């Protein structure tokens, strides 16, 4: 059984984790992704309950920053266009005075493997590539974009008695 009690922060990739990996593009080159609102709620709950949360993605779209800033993530903790995810993960840990083993990381593809191995708990959706499944500590029962992030953020917060909904803080 996985011990979630030492987790002090959460970090994740976007495409294939928070989304199903599908990207729509219009004629002007604007990219569109679909996110599960349950994942967004879990991110907001984590932020409201004092957990640092970070995004480390190869995607460059400013809509990612807008989406997750609105859920409470500090814009400085949103690493867009990441080509060296372990470096960005280490920066996130340093900025929050965390040891890598105190952070849960969600990833789905080869660029995520090094971070998954460094993190305290590496989680992947059930449709992640095989190499990631082999590196993961946990394989979710859910595919990317279908609340696989919520599933394990919630478990970690509940294990610590920190899955607490404050309606007043949530409305701010």
Region spans (language model):
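Alpha-helical substrate-recognition element adjacent to the catalytic core
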Residues: 1-87
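Mg2+-dependent phosphoryl-transfer enzymes with acidic/Ser/Thr/Gly-rich catalytic loops
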Residues: 32-33, 71, 76-79, 86-172
């Amino acid at each position: 059984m996985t011990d979630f009690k030492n987790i002090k922060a959460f970090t994740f990739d976007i495409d294939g984790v928070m989304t199903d990996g599908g990207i729509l593009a219009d004629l002007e080159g604007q990219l569109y992704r679909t996110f599960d609102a349950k994942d967004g709620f879990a991110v907001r709950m984590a932020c409201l309950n004092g957990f640092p949360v970070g995004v480390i993605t190869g995607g460059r779209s400013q809509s990612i920053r807008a989406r997750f800033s609105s859920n409470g993530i500090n814009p400085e903790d949103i690493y867009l266009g990441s080509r060296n995810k372990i470096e960005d993960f280490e920066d996130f840990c340093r900025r929050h005075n965390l040891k890598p083993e105190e952070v849960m990381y969600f990833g789905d593809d080869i660029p995520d493997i090094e971070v998954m191995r460094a993190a305290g708990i590496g989680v992947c959706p059930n449709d992640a590539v095989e190499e990631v499944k082999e590196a993961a500590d946990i394989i979710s029962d859910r595919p990317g974009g279908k609340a696989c992030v919520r599933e394990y953020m919630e478990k970690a917060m509940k294990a610590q008695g920190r899955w607490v909904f404050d309606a007043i803080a949530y409305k701010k």
